């Protein structure tokens, strides 16, 4: 059989599955656009409104709405959309064939583990084994260790295991997006429900990444979980790719008794036709920034900002639509859009796109050795300098979040890695103390060797003199020289056997944290303007580590 190696995760059951990402606005999809130009009450009453959308050509129906006491009229496209085109339907597989094809594509992941952090908990998902929840060691993220270490007193909860007779696999779709779902049972017993914990693991095609990654984990009800994994593997088969993401505009105008008169009906839609081009341009540019470890629910770019997750979108619809009188100020403050003159504002009711709530998590690892600073971000080998340059170019770092720390302003990377500074200094202090202790031990050992050598020499000389007196020959010099050479060789061998801890320490990597403040990279005790300065400062510290005064200068004294 094709998938014998997946015996533990194979099943013919095709039960219905739950998807927390279901979207009430998925079909049809709309964006709400507020035009800057108001309409005259007389034009609205006389029906001087276009009957078709000037960009898409769809018939329009109109509804009067009121926001904060201001009347608005909105043109709603009268269309019906299908979830899949005819060509897509022709290429669809049967449920069993789709499941087997999806399992085949995911086969290379078998035995690999993915990790995810949420709050105080960490999750480990090993394909073919199961999902485990535990509390990570330490109360903060720093220094970052991957995979997240487990606290000594943390219990381990198995949320679900791949068991041959207790695992079901299905391929289904929600919101037009097909995915492979594993229903894992046999988890740790839950005292609140009296049953074992269960989890549904959903694999969805994610074309924007190169590696498998956990998108989110939710507890949909007590001890019953859903986890979604984004993977490029399913994208190899177009039948598992999501349908094209298209939305139709709902254009709204404020209605006023006195408003400028348009020369033509089409004049009301000036500035609308170019919106699509702007969206595509910004989307293409933003895709250069998104990396494999971006922690995101379905993120896409539209016009000038990021979309909200779908669940959060619903909460914000009322906020924006309820404050349309001051919408220009509101949009600018929230960073949603800064439209040019006569261009429409855009609010998307399907997946909101303001940047603030999107968490962009990167695994940042800084290593300072005695001679070299190493820096990397586990994001397709893109360095922090390159990302920082990109954020600077955008002119807005106010809501960037790295490893749980929020950028506070545009001045620079503030508090990115500040929390690890204390740990670094403790480590350096510890190393300094160890170096001092080692030096004292070496000195004591050397003193003992010298004393032993003197005792041996004295004994040899005494015996040589006695021997010379007995036989009447002068053998003092040769005998003394022989024993002295032997004694020195033994001491030298003992010295070589003693490990030089100071030299070993110079080659060890120190996992450290830096932060950027007032235009300078800093570590506690250092204020340097660039990486070369950091390397120089660390090298100076290494060169002077045996000098108590120098340790005191760097804040490393006992």
From Swiss-Prot:
Q: In which residues is a mannooligosaccharide derivative bound?
A: 133, 197, 219, 225
Q: Which InterPro entries match?
A: Man6P_isomerase_rcpt-bd_dom_sf, MRH_dom, OS-9-like, OS9-like_dom
User: What ranges does the record give for the region Disordered, renumbered to this chain?
Assistant: 435-508, 539-558
Its predominant location is endoplasmic reticulum
Point to the regions of Polar residues compositional bias: 474-492
Cellular component (GO) terms are: endoplasmic reticulum lumen; endoplasmic reticulum membrane
Membrane topology category: Peripheral membrane protein
Bias type Basic and acidic residues, positions: 441-466
UniProt biased composition (Acidic residues):
543-558
Query: In the UniProt record, which residues carry a glycan?
Result: 68
Q: Where in the cell is it found?
A: Endoplasmic reticulum membrane
The residue ranges of the MRH domain are 111-237
In Gene Ontology terms, what is one molecular function of this protein? Answer: carbohydrate binding
GO biological process terms, alphabetically, are: endoplasmic reticulum unfolded protein response; retrograde protein transport, ER to cytosol
Extract the signal peptide range: 1-17
Q: Which UniProt keywords apply?
A: Disulfide bond, Endoplasmic reticulum, Glycoprotein, Lectin, Membrane, Signal
Spell out the Pfam families in the cross-references. PRKCSH (PF07915)
**Disulfide-linked positions:** 113-126, 190-223, 205-235
User: Briefly, what is this protein's role?
Assistant: Lectin involved in the quality control of the secretory pathway. As a member of the endoplasmic reticulum-associated degradation lumenal (ERAD-L) surveillance system, targets misfolded endoplasmic reticulum lumenal glycoproteins for degradation.
Q: How does it assemble?
A: Interacts with missfolded ER lumenal proteins.
Family recorded in the similarity comment: Belongs to the OS-9 family.
Name the chain's protein: Protein OS-9 homolog
Gene name per UniProt: YOS9
């Amino acid at each position: 059989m094709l998938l014998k190696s997946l015996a533990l995760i194979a099943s013919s059951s095709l039960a219905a599955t739950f998807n927390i990402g279901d979207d009430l606005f998925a079909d049809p999809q709309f964006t709400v656009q507020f035009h800057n130009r108001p309409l005259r009450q007389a034009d609205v009453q006389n029906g001087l409104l276009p009957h078709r959308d000037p960009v898409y050509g769809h018939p329009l129906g109109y509804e009067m709405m009121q926001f904060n006491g201001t009347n608005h009229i909105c043109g709603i496209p009268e269309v019906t959309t299908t979830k899949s085109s005819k060509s897509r339907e022709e290429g669809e597989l049967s449920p069993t064939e789709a499941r087997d094809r999806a399992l085949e594509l995911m086969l290379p992941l078998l035995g690999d583990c993915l990790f995810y952090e949420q709050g105080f908990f960490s999750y480990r998902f090993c394909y073919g084994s199961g999902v485990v929840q535990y509390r990570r060691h330490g109360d903060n993220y720093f220094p970052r260790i991957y995979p997240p270490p487990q606290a000594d007193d943390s219990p381990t909860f198995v949320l679900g295991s791949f068991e041959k007779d207790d695992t079901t696999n299905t391929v289904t779709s929600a919101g037009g997006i097909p995915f492979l779902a594993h229903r894992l049972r046999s988890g740790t017993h839950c005292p609140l429900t009296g049953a074992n914990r269960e989890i549904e693991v959903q694999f969805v095609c994610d074309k924007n990444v190169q590696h498998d990654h956990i998108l989110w984990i939710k507890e949909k009800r007590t001890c019953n979980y859903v986890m979604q994994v984004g993977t490029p593997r399913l994208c190899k088969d177009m039948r598992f790719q999501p349908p094209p993401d298209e939305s139709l505009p709902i254009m709204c105008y404020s209605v006023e008794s006195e408003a400028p008169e348009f020369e033509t009906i089409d004049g009301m839609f000036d500035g609308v036709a170019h919106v699509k081009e702007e969206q595509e341009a910004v989307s293409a540019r933003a895709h250069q920034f998104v990396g494999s470890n971006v922690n995101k629910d379905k993120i896409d770019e539209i016009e000038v900002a990021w979309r909200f997750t779908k669940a959060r979108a619903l909460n914000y619809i009322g906020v924006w639509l309820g404050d349309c009188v001051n919408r220009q100020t509101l949009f600018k403050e929230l960073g949603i859009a800064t439209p040019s003159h006569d261009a429409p504002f855009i609010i998307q009711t399907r997946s909101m796109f303001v940047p603030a709530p999107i968490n962009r998590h990167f695994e940042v690892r800084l290593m300072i050795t005695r001679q070299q600073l190493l820096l990397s971000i586990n994001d397709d080998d893109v360095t922090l300098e390159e990302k920082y340059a990109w954020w600077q170019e955008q002119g807005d770092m106010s809501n960037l979040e790295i490893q749980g720390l929020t950028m506070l302003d545009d001045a620079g990377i503030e508090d990115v890695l500040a929390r690890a500074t204390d740990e670094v200094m403790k480590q350096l202090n510890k190393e300094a103390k160890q170096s001092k202790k080692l030096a004292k031990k070496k000195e004591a050992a050397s003193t003992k060797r010298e004393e032993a050598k003197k005792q041996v020499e004295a004994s040899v000389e005494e015996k040589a003199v006695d021997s010379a007196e007995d036989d009447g020959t002068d053998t003092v010099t040769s005998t003394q020289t022989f024993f002295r050479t032997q004694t020195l060789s033994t001491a030298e061998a003992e010295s070589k056997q003693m490990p030089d801890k100071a030299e070993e320490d110079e080659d060890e990597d120190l996992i450290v944290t830096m932060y950027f403040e007032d235009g300078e990279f800093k570590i506690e005790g250092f204020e340097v303007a660039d990486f070369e300065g950091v390397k120089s400062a660390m090298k100076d510290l290494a060169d002077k580590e045996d000098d108590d005064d120098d340790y005191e200068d760097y804040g490393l004294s006992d």
